[in-house]
């Protein structure tokens, strides 16, 4: 019987390995940037076209490679970073597995140019799908240039799974920002489709953060520093009042490597307890230095998860350092805001203002005079004549009432009180329960409406109509409003600018890290502008639909969610009636934009069952 187990060809094995290393264009960007850093580069350029699907190029001024190394670097498990297994627990470089370049070369067209400083000529290599096409010498500057074209050209199924350019570009920017924040001593530039998105000169940590996330970020930062035997912490945390609903500006770096840790994030959130609004997320840029032998990086293909020897100690130190920084810079409250101070004041004095007492001095007073001598000073307390108690009963008939002579006709009273004619003439009235539900009587029973979901449905259909027909009304602002966003967010706003204008936004200018708004949709107040746009950008960053209609739909949903009346908001009776009427004027009144029930009906039969009638 013939054997059925066979060794896979190298190019097939490389494609399988590429599935773990290269998931999308951002994965290629991450690997190439880290290789440039390991090469000792002080200047790194990143160039992309069509969100990396067509072209990704990384150019550095590092030490370069020899002719032999240039060819060997594309072999699997070929690396200059480690020599033995023990080196995995004493890592000082970004890469160490030696499979990134082999994986990239297996699923793309790769062109590499490299030259060492002491060499006169460099090496030029072209590889297509793991196959060496050519290797030549060339006149090159010191450093290395990797050009990756047509990603997943030989795996159509993987290419079809890529998201829209906006989404893929967002992932690339995320990776670029993480690397740039971890290495503020390196000059980074990033170009996309010929436009410069980032130009980050060498600087300190604070300036690097400001250069990436706009100038307004500087006033939001609180420095943090702590040094212990097992952990050193440096960086910045955000002031609570600037916390957002999204988790965009949260970064942990361990030994200059970006990581994700829900455990350490919980320590930060614990330190902010009582300082944040519900659902708000603080920003933080924290650099943790630990001995390399106390962590294990080799547990995840992307190296974003790390195993610590003593997580509990790190948790306690990080939480304590964060609380200390918040208190040191007068961010943490010094009063207990949950205490009801009205309990300290007698009820009868709660609404009274303090009065300065009047002091009268007797100039003739002599303590050595005999007590029998009367002073000229006299004090007469002010008295008011109280009405005689009998006046309380003036006008009352003193004649006794004979209860026996009174008759009660309960049936007659009941029938007149609830007569059919009066019930029909009574106006329809709405009631608000717990500032959450609106109850409206109907012929068959009662209608119970969720006010937040109902308002979301109303606003959603209004915004969707305005976006579709491009006839939204705008309110012009007397003074333009400037809002600041990160580079990642600004790239997204540039892409959806036309759709935003169709909702009623009027942009006076779109700068590198800010926008100037001169007009708003009629349903958006000036104070709500930043909230609406932040929520919109946050929602679209999660997943930007490919089709234009789906993008409009997502925008309408996001704006409706931001502007809808919230649970816990008191509504006047007029507002309740308007909400009910507008809800049933919608095309899909039964559900919210997020497919949640907007109202339920409770019939008379249901009420009878409750009362066991």
Swiss-Prot record:
One of its GO terms (cellular component) is mismatch repair complex. Gene3D superfamilies: 3.30.230.10, Histidine kinase-like ATPase, C-terminal domain, MutL, C-terminal domain, dimerisation subdomain, MutL, C-terminal domain, regulatory subdomain. Keywords: DNA damage, DNA repair. The keyword DNA damage applies. It holds the Pfam family HATPase_c_3. PANTHER family: DNA MISMATCH REPAIR PROTEIN MLH, PMS, MUTL (PTHR10073), DNA MISMATCH REPAIR PROTEIN MLH1 (PTHR10073:SF12). This protein is involved in the repair of mismatches in DNA. It is required for dam-dependent methyl-directed DNA mismatch repair. May act as a 'molecular matchmaker', a protein that promotes the formation of a stable complex between two or more DNA-binding proteins in an ATP-dependent manner without itself being part of a final effector complex. Belongs to the DNA mismatch repair MutL/HexB family. This is DNA mismatch repair protein MutL. It comes from Flavobacterium psychrophilum (strain ATCC 49511 / DSM 21280 / CIP 103535 / JIP02/86). The gene is mutL.
């Amino acid at each position: 019987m013939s054997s059925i187990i066979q060794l896979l060809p190298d190019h097939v094995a490389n494609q399988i390995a590429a599935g773990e290393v290269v998931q999308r264009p951002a994965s290629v960007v991450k690997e190439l940037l880290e290789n440039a850093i390991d090469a000792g580069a002080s200047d790194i350029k990143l160039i992309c076209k069509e969100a990396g699907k067509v072209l990704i190029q990384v150019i550095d001024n590092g030490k370069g490679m020899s002719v032999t190394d240039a060819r060997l670097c594309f072999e699997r498990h070929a690396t200059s970073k480690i020599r033995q297994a023990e080196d995995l627990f004493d890592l000082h470089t970004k890469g160490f597995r030696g499979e990134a370049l082999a994986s990239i070369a297996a699923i793309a067209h790769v062109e590499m140019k490299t030259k060492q400083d002491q060499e006169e000529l460099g090496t030029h290599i072209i590889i297509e799908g793991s196959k060496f096409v050519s290797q030549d010498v060339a006149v090159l500057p010191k450093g290395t240039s990797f050009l990756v074209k047509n990603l997943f050209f030989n795996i159509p199924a993987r290419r079809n799974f890529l998201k829209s350019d906006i989404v893929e570009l967002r992932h690339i920017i995320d990776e670029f920002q993480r690397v740039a924040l971890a290495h503020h001593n390196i000059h980074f530039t990033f170009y996309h489709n010929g436009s410069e998105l980032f130009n980050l000169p060498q600087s300190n940590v604070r300036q690097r953060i400001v250069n990436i996330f706009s100038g307004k970020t500087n006033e939001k930062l609180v420095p943090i520093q702590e040094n212990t035997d097992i952990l050193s912490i440096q960086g910045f945390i955000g002031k609570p009042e600037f916390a957002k609903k999204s988790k965009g500006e949260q970064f942990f770096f361990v030994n200059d490597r970006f990581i994700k840790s829900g455990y350490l994030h919980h320590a930060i959130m614990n330190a902010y307890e009582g300082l944040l609004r519900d659902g708000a997320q603080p920003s933080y840029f924290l650099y943790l230095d630990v001995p390399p032998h106390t962590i294990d990086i080799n547990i995840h293909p992307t190296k974003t998860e790390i195993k610590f020897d003593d997580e509990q100690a790190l948790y306690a130190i990080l939480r304590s350092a964060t609380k200390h920084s918040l208190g040191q810079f007068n961010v943490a409250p010094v009063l207990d805001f949950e205490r009801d101070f009205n309990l300290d004041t007698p009820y009868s004095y709660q609404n009274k203002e303090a009065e300065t007492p009047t002091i009268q001095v007797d100039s003739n007073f002599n303590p050595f005079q005999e007590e029998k001598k009367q002073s000229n000073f006299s004090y007469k307390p002010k008295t008011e004549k109280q009405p005689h108690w009998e006046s309380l009963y003036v006008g009352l008939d003193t004649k006794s009432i004979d209860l026996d002579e009174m008759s009660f006709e309960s049936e007659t009273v009941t029938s007149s009180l609830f007569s059919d004619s009066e019930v029909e003439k009574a106006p329809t009235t709405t009631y608000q329960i717990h500032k959450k539900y609106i109850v409206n009587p109907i012929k068959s029973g009662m209608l119970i409406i969720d006010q937040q979901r109902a308002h979301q449905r109303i606003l959603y259909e209004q915004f969707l109509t305005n976006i579709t027909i491009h006839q939204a009304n705008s309110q012009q602002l007397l003074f333009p409003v400037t809002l600041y966003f990160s580079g990642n967010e600004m790239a997204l706003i540039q892409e959806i600018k036309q759709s935003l204008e169709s909702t009623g936004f009027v942009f006076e200018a779109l700068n590198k890290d800010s926008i100037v708004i001169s007009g708003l949709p009629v349903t958006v107040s000036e104070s709500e502008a930043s909230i609406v746009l932040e929520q919109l950008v946050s929602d679209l960053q999660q997943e930007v639909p490919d089709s234009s209609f789906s993008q409009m739909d997502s925008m309408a949903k996001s704006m409706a969610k931001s502007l809808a009346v919230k649970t816990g908001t008191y509504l006047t009776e007029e507002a309740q009636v308007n909400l009910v009427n507008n809800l049933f004027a919608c095309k899909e009144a039964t559900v919210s934009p997020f497919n949640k029930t907007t109202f339920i009906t409770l019939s008379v039969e249901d009420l009878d069952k409750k009362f066991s009638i």
